[in-house]
């Protein structure tokens, strides 16, 4: 039997944490193992509870979710982070993803979609709500003042094998591993192996950052 995904809730609002806990209690493959009420408590809570996935609010009083995500992702063998917030401004989305978040969802996202996001990031996929995905692509495509980053991204994509590039481009379109496997006629295990190699070769932390790099490379080619 597959082990349940261990989840840590991080939000300064006790009512929000309680609501999330109640909602996730109905998901049989998810186990809420702990809570923290501020970004400063994340490292201690992670050490104590050893979660697989952290659901992280952005706006918190002492240490916000973006700084906490960056701090957490700098640790050895960190859990995946899904940012869950009422705010979906362009700047917040991009800052959270560049900090290492594997997903960005709004708090009004349907419960089933939140559960799916947790399961996807635990399996190594990324997760963005459709509205946030559209914003992100538009934002990165329109970012100015970063030609060096765009050129660097293009050079990185040119340095990998053609098959790895196909996988990277599919990740950049937001496809999960199963869809990439079907499209490129390979097994899911092979896709996972390609993604793992891409993380190392491209120097990024997760598949969402692969998608950001792909978009940067696309901008460099325009």
Label the predicted regions:
Residues 44, 66-77:
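Short amphipathic alpha-helix used as the core "switch/output" element in two-component signaling
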Residues 173-209:
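Recognition helix of helix-turn-helix DNA-binding domains
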Residues 60:
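Receiver (REC) domain active-site loop signature in two-component systems and cognate sites
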Residues 38-41, 63-67:
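Acidic catalytic/metal-coordinating carboxylates
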Residues 49-55:
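Active-site beta3 strand of CheY-like receiver
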Residues 93-98, 108-162, 166, 216-219:
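Short, flexible helix-to-coil linker/hinge segments that flank and couple to helix-turn-helix
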Residues 57, 85:
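Active-site residues of response regulator receiver
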């Amino acid at each position: 039997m597959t082990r349940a995904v261990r989840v840590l809730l991080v939000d300064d609002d006790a009512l929000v944490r309680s609501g999330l806990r109640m909602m996730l209690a109905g998901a049989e493959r998810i186990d809420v193992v702990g809570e923290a009420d501020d970004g400063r408590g994340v490292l201690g809570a992670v050490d104590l509870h050893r979660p697989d996935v952290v659901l992280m609010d952005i706006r918190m009083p002492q240490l916000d979710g973006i700084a906490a995500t960056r701090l957490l992702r700098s640790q050895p063998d960190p859990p995946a982070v899904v940012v869950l917030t009422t705010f979906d401004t362009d700047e917040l989305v991009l800052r959270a993803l560049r900090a290492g978040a594997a997903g960005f969802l709004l708090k009004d996202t349907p419960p089933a979609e939140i559960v799916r996001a947790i399961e996807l990031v635990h399996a190594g996929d990324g997760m963005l709500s459709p509205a946030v995905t559209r914003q992100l692509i538009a934002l990165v495509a329109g970012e100015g003042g970063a030609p060096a980053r765009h050129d660097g991204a293009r050079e990185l994509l040119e340095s990998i094998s053609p098959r790895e590039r196909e996988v990277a481009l599919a990740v950049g379109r937001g496809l999960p591993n199963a869809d990439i496997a079907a499209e490129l006629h390979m097994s899911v295990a092979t896709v996972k192996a390609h993604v793992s190699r891409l993380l190392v070769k491209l120097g990024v932390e997760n598949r969402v950052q692969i998608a950001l790099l792909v978009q940067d490379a696309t901008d460099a080619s325009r």
